[in-house]
Amino acid sequence: FNEVFDVAVRMFPDDPTANINAAAIELQRGDLQQSVRYLDKADAQASATLNNRGVLKLLQGDLDSAESYFKQAQAKGSVEAGANLEEMVNKRKDDAIFGK
């Protein structure tokens, strides 16, 4: 299934939706630099872009920025961002408990 998104972004390199999907795939693969390249071509105000930027910031350890992106995406109706925000809150609690 990921191959479909890879092909789509190669065929339509400036399409915002193709870039959002490709960014999500790269985040799953752990290629944060490539995900940034795709996110930079996506619609900056789309809820999916904001959510993916939140995931990126979370993976980079920038919880404050991640929270901001998740809240913005959630305000635009992203259910995924709400779930990610909840996970981030749990991570902060774990970090506080375990002294990270």
Language-model features, listed with the residues they occupy:
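Start-of-helix register in tetratricopeptide repeats
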Residues: 17, 48, 80-82
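Canonical positions in the second alpha-helix
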Residues: 7-8, 38-42, 72-73
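Short coil turns that delineate tetratricopeptide repeat
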Residues: 13, 44-47, 76-78
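Register position in tetratricopeptide repeats
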Residues: 28, 59, 87-95
